[in-house]
Amino acid sequence: ETLHCAHYQALNPVVSEGMVQMAMGTPAALYNGGLLQTHLFYFDPHRQRPGLPEHVAALVDRASNDSVRVHLVNTNPVEAVPVVLQAGAFGEHRFGEALFDANGLSQQVAVDGRHLRVDLGPAVSLVIELSLTRYAHRPSYGRPPQ
């Protein structure tokens, strides 16, 4: 029996491709069990787990070979929320510089590493343009330092 590459999508009622593409700036894994190749990956430092923290939304609206732009929003009107951005699903990429833009105010920061911690204030919307060197590090399942 020959199966189409989208065969497993018909069996699974949860389709996450759209969310993966919007939040991480990449198409979803090509087949069931394939490795995810992303520009960005997120960690929740409070819960010490992969993924976006509660009340945080992310949208990648531009991605290229050497940069990625992401919009981060903290929907919590009362509390600040930290989020850690990782360069690549396995930390295989390296961030060079980050250009932060919040309400027209810009700030450039040198990162030069796999991880960037961002503390989002209450009800804050932020745009970050990150320069990216692809495949600068050996891929790893390691987590960001606490």
Where are each of the predicted segments found?
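Catalytic domains of carbohydrate-active enzymes that cleave complex glycans
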Residues: 1-69, 75-77, 128
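A structural detector for beta-sheet-dominated domains
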Residues: 61-63, 73, 86-88, 101, ...
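Beta-strand secondary-structure signal
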Residues: 69-71, 82-84, 117, 127-129
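Surface-exposed beta-strand/loop patches in extracellular or lumenal glycoproteins
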Residues: 76-91
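Composition- and surface-driven signal marking solvent-exposed, interaction-prone regions
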Residues: 82-86, 98, 141-145
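C-terminal, active-site-flanking charged/polar segments
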Residues: 90-93, 123
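Solvent-exposed beta-strand/loop surfaces of large extracellular or lumenal domains
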Residues: 95-116
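C-terminal beta-strand-rich structural cap/linker in extracellular carbohydrate-active enzymes
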Residues: 112-146
